[in-house]
Amino acid sequence: MRVHAAHLLVPVPSTPRRHATLRFTVSAAATSVNVNQADAARKQAVIVGGGLAGLAAATHLASLSVPFTLLEASDRVGGRVATDEVDGYLLDRGFQIFLTAYPECQRLLDFQALRLQPFFPGALVYLGAGESGSPFHMLSDPFRFPIRSLSSVFSPVGTLPDKLLVGITRLRAAATPDDVNLSSPETTTARHLEKLGFSPSIVERFLRPLLAGIFFDTALDTSSRLFELVFKRLVLGDNALPEAGIGAIAAQLADRLPAGSVRLNARAASIDPSSGVTLDTGEAVSGELGVIVAVEQPEAEKLLPQLPARPKSKKPAERSTVCLYFSADRAATNVAPSYAPAGKVLVSVSLVGSFAEREDGELAGEVVRELGGWFGAGEVASWAHLRTYRIGFAQPDQMPPTEPAGRDPRVGDGVYVCGDHVRRRDGVWEEGGRGPGQGWGAVPILELRNLASVREDFH
């Protein structure tokens, strides 16, 4: 087992704890199958799935005054973007970060209201005790913290040419338009880093662990195009966590939707372009203006048999992660004060893979033992295991070759698909709020305007 990232989310004693109340404008449950006549007569679109993709699609439809009903199978919106409160700690369901540089996020979200807590633009790299005596070595962004980054020049994490190459790659990424990046020759990220000229030292000590934690892919088989997209976002913005947890992103989107437009505990069983959506209860929900399927890839393939089949040579890649949370008394870093009660520390540990053969308690014990070698046995002795989250489908298949023309979001007459597994026909991955490569995936705005035009025909 290899721990790829340990994050200490720590309270600042002088900062009072503020609990944000997450309010949703949603129906408490799909309680009634007897839709009143006025609702039955209303022409509407139907969105299947209340994750970020579905919420983003709903937000766009609302902005165009297109009536819709969003159907969410669970008892809450947000999908994988959720936060649980346990004994005063805020536990995101899987360690997630918010990248502020995504244009779609900037258009849809109120950053100030989220009270974002940014990460320092750098990393402490664990190499074990060496000649310097310290097991950790700092790498920081020289363009944001030039003085502090001087120590990075002399760190054993890569060679001096490697560090110069990081700076060159940073400048190039910031200046290159997305359409140029995403139409470039495609290979794996591992091969791409080699072609760029990075040494095995910096790849194995820094880039592979970093990118494996982002893509949940230790082999770095992820598309080089996606690497360029994500690296650019890392360069141009902050990594941050909302004060009330990552679930506050979904809460903010849901709170802006029209009252009664979201139905919870409403699971879609089938989709018929001519009649709309049938729930597992047998209720039919009409979708005269179209149906937008905004669920993760495996579920989308069940609901939409007409989706293009994957190439037989390309098996779905597992993109699983396990996130373990511990409470502690002392801190090594200070990232998100609001995630822990006063005087306590929240430790988040991310593992790449499913570890299905290990029970939660066994896995937590292994993690504590390994990190005892990082921070010292005395430091981790006070850690108490809070909860383990196993995310089986954390990201979709992102290995090359990706679809050269992208997938048309229209998969049938009046039926659209969106989500983090969809790439638009212009070659652009839809951008994300959960983290790199995991995003809104909303239907392109042109298609939504077409729905608005259709709506006018019904009036």
Regions found by a protein language model. Name each.
Residues 1-23:
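N-terminal chloroplast transit peptides
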Residues 3-7, 28, 402-459:
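C-terminal lid/capping helical subdomain adjacent to the catalytic/cofactor pocket in oxidative enzymes
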Residues 37-70:
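N-terminal Rossmann-like FAD-binding beta1-loop-alpha1 element of flavoenzymes
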Residues 62-86:
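Glycine-rich FAD pyrophosphate-binding loop
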Residues 63, 288-290, 295-402, 429:
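C-terminal segments that line or cap access tunnels to active or ligand-binding sites in enzymes
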Residues 84-107:
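N-terminal glycine-rich dinucleotide-binding loop that anchors FAD/FMN and/or NAD(P) in oxidoreductases
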Residues 102-106, 110-224, 231-236:
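Mobile amphipathic helical/loop "lid" adjacent to a hydrophobic cofactor/ligand pocket
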Residues 228-290:
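Helical element adjacent to the flavin cofactor pocket in flavoenzyme catalytic cores
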